[in-house]
């Protein structure tokens, strides 16, 4: 089995995901490398953070540099010198993020290229073929990521189209004799009955894992957690569960507690570029004047390169001067913070002390 469930603590799960390019310990956080890189970091620096798997984007790599360039190197892994597993988004998120320039039909989605404005058309089959050429360890089906809010009628129509695309994705994946994994994406907006319909049909088709899409798109937190609790009960226990796009530390804790195994999000890297840094007691804005003369490390509990070698004062200086080194050091730290958090969550599940860990976490981060 590609997924091994090793231990539970309530609904939380400790597991291992066995990919062609390596093993991923779950719960796992996957940093986002849209264009084949985690912004500002080398592959070795990403690996040093404790990252075991990264996410890249089918749609954007298809447009630039193009499959012909990546295939010259043999695979996306070799192109970016990453030795671990890679999961690729199918392009479904671009159906959401490029909504002003796209047209949805049952056949697929037409887009205006964000690079030069020329028209491109992406079908479920084409998305699977691109991911096959990239040699993604985990391939995602093509779907529509539904915006919030939306009407029940629109969401039902969208779910039906996505289910059609799921069947076509499954068929094309199988005809390519792909040895990697294929994950489905459960949609349905904030409507439990439509989530039920989506999950039931996808489970009937059969996939290696099940992602939860259409969350963290602007809905209230209580709505996200409500839908998350509902869906986790629907997914077979022997399959990995992947929450797409949600990534604040408290979201990770709540979702792990509900039974989620995998996460991706741009928050740690994007926040790092904007000078917002995660520390044991919460978050800090490193540009604030209070850090100008602060000679202490960014986080005394952190073992990352940044915290072992530089002070808050120096990071404050780099941020004020807009030095690229500051962005790199911030990113190294934030990514390590997230991977340390996942390591601590896995250890808490292993020792059946997750609730105690979460209680301590919330008490600690409220100090700032």
Swiss-Prot record:
Cofactor annotation remark: Binds 1 zinc ion per subunit.
Keywords, alphabetical: Glycosyltransferase, Metal-binding, Queuosine biosynthesis, Transferase, tRNA processing, Zinc
GO BP annotation list: queuosine biosynthetic process; tRNA wobble guanine modification; tRNA-guanine transglycosylation
Region RNA binding, residue ranges: 269-273
SUPFAM superfamilies hit by this protein: tRNA-guanine transglycosylase
Pathway note: tRNA modification; tRNA-queuosine biosynthesis
Reaction it catalyzes: 7-aminomethyl-7-carbaguanine + guanosine(34) in tRNA = 7-aminomethyl-7-carbaguanosine(34) in tRNA + guanine
The EC number(s) this enzyme carries: 2.4.2.29
SS bond list: none
Catalytic class of the enzyme: transferase
Function of the protein: Catalyzes the base-exchange of a guanine (G) residue with the queuine precursor 7-aminomethyl-7-deazaguanine (PreQ1) at position 34 (anticodon wobble position) in tRNAs with GU(N) anticodons (tRNA-Asp, -Asn, -His and -Tyr). Catalysis occurs through a double-displacement mechanism. The nucleophile active site attacks the C1' of nucleotide 34 to detach the guanine base from the RNA, forming a covalent enzyme-RNA intermediate. The proton acceptor active site deprotonates the incoming PreQ1, allowing a nucleophilic attack on the C1' of the ribose to form the product.
Protein name, entry field: Queuine tRNA-ribosyltransferase
Origin species: Blochmanniella pennsylvanica (strain BPEN)
């Amino acid at each position: 089995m590609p997924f091994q469930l090793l231990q539970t603590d309530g609904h939380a799960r400790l597991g291992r995901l066995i990919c062609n390019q390596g093993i991923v310990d779950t719960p796992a956080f996957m940093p986002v490398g849209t264009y084949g890189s985690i912004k500002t970091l080398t592959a070795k620096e990403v690996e040093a953070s404790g990252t075991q798997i990264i996410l890249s984007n089918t749609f954007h790599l298809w447009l630039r540099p193009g499959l012909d360039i990546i295939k010259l190197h043999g695979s996306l892994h070799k192109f970016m010198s990453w030795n671990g597993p890679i999961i690729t988004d199918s392009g479904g998120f671009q159906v959401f993020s490029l909504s002003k320039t796209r047209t949805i039909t049952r056949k697929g989605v037409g887009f205006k290229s964000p690079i030069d404005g020329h028209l491109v058309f992406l079908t479920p089959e084409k998305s699977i073929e691109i991911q096959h050429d990239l040699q993604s360890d985990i391939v995602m089906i093509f779907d529509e990521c539904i915006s919030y809010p939306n009407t029940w009628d629109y969401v039902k129509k969208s779910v039906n189209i996505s289910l059609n695309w799921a069947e076509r994705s499954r068929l094309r994946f199988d005809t390519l004799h792909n040895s990697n994994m294929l994950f489905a994406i459960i949609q349905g907006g904030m409507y439990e009955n439509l989530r039920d319909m989506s999950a039931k049909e996808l489970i009937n088709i059969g996939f290696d894992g099940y992602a939860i899409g259409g969350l963290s798109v602007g809905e209230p937190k209580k709505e996200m957690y409500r839908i998350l609790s509902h869906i986790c009960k629907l997914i077979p226990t022997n399959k990995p569960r992947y929450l797409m796009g949600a990534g604040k530390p408290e979201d990770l804790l709540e979702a792990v507690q509900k039974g989620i195994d995998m996460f991706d999000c741009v928050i740690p890297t994007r926040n790092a570029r904007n000078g917002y840094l995660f520390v044991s007691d919460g978050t800090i804005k490193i540009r604030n004047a209070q850090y100008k003369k602060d000679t202490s490390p960014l986080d005394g509990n952190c073992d990352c390169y940044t915290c072992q070698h530089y002070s808050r004062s120096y990071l404050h200086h780099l941020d004020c001067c807009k030095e690229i080194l500051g962005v790199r050091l911030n990113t190294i730290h934030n990514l390590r913070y997230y991977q340390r958090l996942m390591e601590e969550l896995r250890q808490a599940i292993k020792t059946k002390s997750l609730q105690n860990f979460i209680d301590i976490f919330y008490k600690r981060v409220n100090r700032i």
